[in-house]
Amino acid sequence: MNPNQKIITIGSICMVIGIVSLMLQIGNMISIWVSHSIQTGNQHQAEPISNTNFLTEKAVASVTLAGNSSLCPISGWAVHSKDNSIRIGSKGDVFVIREPFISCSHLECRTFFLTQGALLNDKHSNGTVKDRSPHRTLMSCPVGEAPSPYNSRFESVAWSASACHDGTSWLTIGISGPDNGAVAVLKYNGIITDTIKSWRNNILRTQESECACVNGSCFTVMTDGPSNGQASYKIFKMEKGKVVKSVELDAPNYHYEECSCYPDAGEITCVCRDNWHGSNRPWVSFNQNLEYQIGYICSGVFGDNPRPNDGTGSCGPVSPNGAYGVKGFSFKYGNGVWIGRTKSTNSRSGFEMIWDPNGWTGTDSSFSVKQDIVAITDWSGYSGSFVQHPELTGLDCIRPCFWVELIRGRPKESTIWTSGSSISFCGVNSDTVGWSWPDGAELPFTIDK
């Protein structure tokens, strides 16, 4: 075979290979196109089913938290959560916080908290003992988790706050601004729906615990005025994040701050802090039309801090050691009352739950149950109530629960910061145990040295 024949033969072979390759590519493209067309057709056919499923899930997820049931009968308190945020924050990214509280929807419980716009063990944690600053925000995370930038959801700019779920969406109330003109911003499902302006221009403030919802309406209590004298107190009724009614309490010689509110048989009961002159706790109860009654817990087992030793109570303010105070709570059961309080009478340390079977109306100091929560040698702080509705628990009653803030740092410890972790308990009618569940962090941190 001469050179020309070789060239022709090689060229012919290459041409045949090229044609075969081209045909294979065309066949492959046709196959891909047909396959894609079939898949697209299947997707188009499935879309109505997908939309139907989505709408069905939303319908199931949206309920009305009735709040018409009574509180569950209980014999003690079972531990529900502990976030250990200060211990974890010595090494991890954890927010500097105060005023944590818990609230539950019909699907989940979340911890809400007021951040300081800073992380533990960081330079911006310096000076965070201050209550009110433009850097404070209300955020939330799943209950029991340490609040960090990775698991937390922004809710509102706030140095005083409340939040609750009506069965459809979260309502948040965040107060921010100057002391002489603060404004409460109401959000429903994350959207601003209303505002409330300070009416006395003297540190408008609210609960620092959950608001209470009944039959689609939610209720909160706010204070405006002196922290050491007669102030003004209002109850607000909200629907889908908008104020629909409010009433100012006619309460001379009463002092209400940082109320802990809960629904019970279709009405709302709030147990509050008297920072003026009471070492027992004031209460206000009201129906859905905001018709209210007021009083003080009569028991000689006093619930505030500081307070005198237990003795003879009063259905008005008990004056000895009555000035100042700490946020707290109680649960009313007929004439009886579960009282949560610090173990110490003069510092925010220790915590215990006491059942006084006659304490709502009786003035003696006898009680029948005491359950230890935090030892007197460990720091506690604010405490407050929350509830779990039957729509969450499957019970036929409203389960009472409470949380305790475990404050660490300034002003009692040698740090540059103030923050806290939290624990929570829920009422049960079965076996429980008393113990101590302290914060447990070893201080100071690296930033403090």
Curated annotation (Swiss-Prot):
Sites binding substrate sit at: 98, 132, 257-258, 273, 348
Chain segments carrying region Hypervariable stalk region: 36-70
UniProt KW Calcium keyword: yes
Region annotated Head of neuraminidase, chain positions: 71-449
Segments crossing the lipid bilayer:
7-27
Q: Which domain of life is it from?
A: Viruses
**Which positions are annotated as binding Ca(2+)?**
274, 278, 304
The record places the following residue ranges in the Virion surface compartment, namely 28-449
**Stretch list, region Involved in apical transport and lipid raft association:** 11-33
Task: Name the protein family.
Answer: Belongs to the glycosyl hydrolase 34 family.
Domain notes, please? Answer: Intact N-terminus is essential for virion morphogenesis. Possesses two apical sorting signals, one in the ectodomain, which is likely to be a glycan, and the other in the transmembrane domain. The transmembrane domain also plays a role in lipid raft association.
Instruction: Describe the task this protein carries out.
Output: Catalyzes the removal of terminal sialic acid residues from viral and cellular glycoconjugates. Cleaves off the terminal sialic acids on the glycosylated HA during virus budding to facilitate virus release. Additionally helps virus spread through the circulation by further removing sialic acids from the cell surface. These cleavages prevent self-aggregation and ensure the efficient spread of the progeny virus from cell to cell. Otherwise, infection would be limited to one round of replication.
Subunit: Homotetramer.
Protein name as annotated: Neuraminidase
Question: What is this protein's gene name?
Answer: NA
